[in-house]
Swiss-Prot record:
It comes from Brucella ovis (strain ATCC 25840 / 63/290 / NCTC 10512). Its EC number is 2.4.2.9. Disulfide bonds: none annotated. Uracil binds at residues 193, 198-200. 5-phospho-alpha-D-ribose 1-diphosphate binds at residues 78, 103, 130-138, 199. This is Uracil phosphoribosyltransferase. Binds 1 Mg(2+) ion per subunit. The magnesium is bound as Mg-PRPP.
Length: 208
């Protein structure tokens, strides 16, 4: 399906402020909400429409509305939750799934500790959200789990991606399109994206 880099000037401007090491936790959290709304606009750009009969104050008309069941936003915990607020502001009727994964700092492999999703996920477009696509191990594991539950229409949304992560992800899930604000230079020896913005979860919640 490929990779879409969202190059909108507002996205790029806000991302630059988020990258700065002196940006406060409060500002980082606010910017993450703002940029997630803009990214959500892009990832939902080609949703299918149908029409419904309505009446305006002047006359009846056939007006466009979204077709099919509501979206599912699937957050990879914990950092993925930072993207949810802005996205739910834009699509308040969306369902939400949570996938609890943490990365073993020695092996860099994901370890699952929680999974909760709508039962009828098979009939819905699922947008998986995580700020970083670094090694891609967590993203691959999350989508493996969603596919096990029957999801077939999946997209992945992140702030930053590493070339190594994109390569691994697209090999594992070639049917899932990736949307990101930036493809950075590389991963460092600890598996972090560089130049990156640090640990998104820590910067969002003020932890280390």
């Amino acid at each position: 399906m490929g990779v879409t880099v969202v190059s909108h000037p507002l996205v790029q401007h806000k991302l630059t402020i988020m990258r700065k090491k002196e940006t406060s936790t409060a500002s980082f959290r606010r910017l993450l909400k703002e940029i997630s709304l803009l990214l959500c606009y892009e990832v939902t750009r080609n949703l299918e429409l149908t029409t419904m009969s309505i009446e305006t104050p002047l006359m009846p008309m056939e007006a466009p509305v979204l077709e099919g069941k509501k979206l599912v936003f699937a957050s990879i915990l914990r950092a993925g939750n930072g993207l949810l607020e802005g996205m739910l502001d834009l699509v308040p009727a969306a369902r939400v799934a949570h996938i609890g994964l943490y990365r073993d700092h020695d092996t860099l492999q994901p370890i699952e500790y929680y999974f909760k999703a709508p039962e009828d996920i098979v009939n819905r477009l699922v947008i998986v959200v995580d700020p970083m696509l670094a090694t891609a191990n967590s993203a691959i594991a999350a989508i493996d789990k969603l596919k096990e539950r029957g999801a077939t229409n999946i997209r992945f949304l992140c702030l930053l991606a590493a070339p190594e992560g994109i390569e691994r992800f697209t090999k594992a899930h070639p049917d899932v399109e990736v949307f990101t604000a930036s493809i950075d230079e590389r991963l460092d020896e600890k598996g972090y994206i560089v130049p990156g913005l640090g640990d998104a979860g820590d910067r969002m919640y003020g932890t280390k």
